[in-house]
Design a protein with these regions (language model features):
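Long, positively charged, glycine-interspersed low-complexity recognition regions
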Residues: 215-269
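Positions that flank functional sites
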Residues: 34-35, 191, 243-244
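GST-like fold's C-terminal all-alpha helical module
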Residues: 106-226, 230
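Generic structural signal for individual residues within well-ordered alpha-helical segments
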Residues: 45, 91-94, 197, 222, ...
């Protein structure tokens, strides 16, 4: 029995839903509205003290961290392998998944909050607004995430250091373009956990209406993303769980934010 605690817009939860879909493994979902603070409820904090999603429970065993979850799923359900056979390709796969966890995910959090989610948080009633910001554990997405998220919500695109995060995000599209120039998928010629790991982060840019970051200048990334979107598991895992109002707001606020994004991307680091 697999239970997955998740949210529709969480890139990390999407990674796990994508892997479960590719594996063809049935699961029971427990939906947490992370924008209303469901992840701070005491019962969930017992499962995940970081107050983040996803958390997977398999036969009573609690497994946090999306990359760890996906590696676990690939070992427990080996019928549809998501790791390359070649050791060098497996190493390349893990370079991608490690980079996602350590570098790209924190950047994605800052990008998403500055461009869109801060507007949702600012609409909360004053008591809920303060409770939401105060309930965030400091050791969450990054060290001092509680303080950083407050800055992102209140300062938006004027948050100090935000441009570095946008340019870092953009640099990973360059890394993808280079890697895909000589192979079909990120870790070689077979679809793997590397592609699953990167998909939600490219899709996040797409949902913000920023496809121009690759469509005209990065043909390999463009072709890769088209192959990804053609997979039957993509839409159920990446799109269908996102609440329609949030999907609409990501696109609306993303498009409104694009001039600010262009400005940050054009600045020297």
């Amino acid at each position: 029995m697999i239970d997955l605690y998740h949210h529709g817009s969480s890139v990390c939860a999407a990674k796990v839903r994508f892997a479960l879909g590719e594996k063809g493994v049935a699961w029971e979902g427990h939906y947490l509205d992370i924008h209303k603070g469901d992840q701070f409820e005491p019962e969930y904090l017992k499962l995940n003290p970081k107050a983040v999603v996803p958390t997977l429970v398999h036969n009573g065993r609690v497994i946090p961290e999306s990359t760890v979850i996906n590696e676990y799923l690939d070992e427990v359900f080996p019928e549809v392998p998501l790791k390359p056979n070649d050791p060098q390709a497996r190493a390349a796969m893990r370079v991608w998944t490690k980079a996602v966890d350590e570098v790209l995910h924190p950047a994605c959090a800052e990008v998403t909050f500055s461009a869109c989610l801060r507007h949702r948080v600012k609409r909360l009633p004053p008591k809920e607004y303060e409770k939401f910001l105060a309930s965030t554990p400091s050791q969450s997405v990054t060290p001092q995430w509680r303080e950083r998220r407050r800055d992102l919500v209140t300062l938006g695109f004027d948050t100090p250091g935000l441009g570095e995060q946008y340019r870092l995000y953009d640099s990973y599209l360059d890394k993808m373009e280079k890697s895909l120039a000589h192979q079909l998928w990120l870790a070689g010629d077979t679809f793997s956990l590397a592609d699953i790991a990167m998909t939600p982060y490219v899709n996040r840019l797409d949902m913000l209406g920023w496809g121009q970051m690759w469509e005209q200048t990065r043909p390999q990334v463009t072709a890769w993303f088209e192959r990804i979107k053609a997979r039957p598991t993509f839409k159920p895992a990446l799109l269908d769980w996102c609440p329609p109002d949030l999907t609409a707001e990501l696109l609306t606020f993303g498009r409104q934010s694009w001039p600010s994004v262009e400005r940050l991307l054009s600045q020297a680091s």
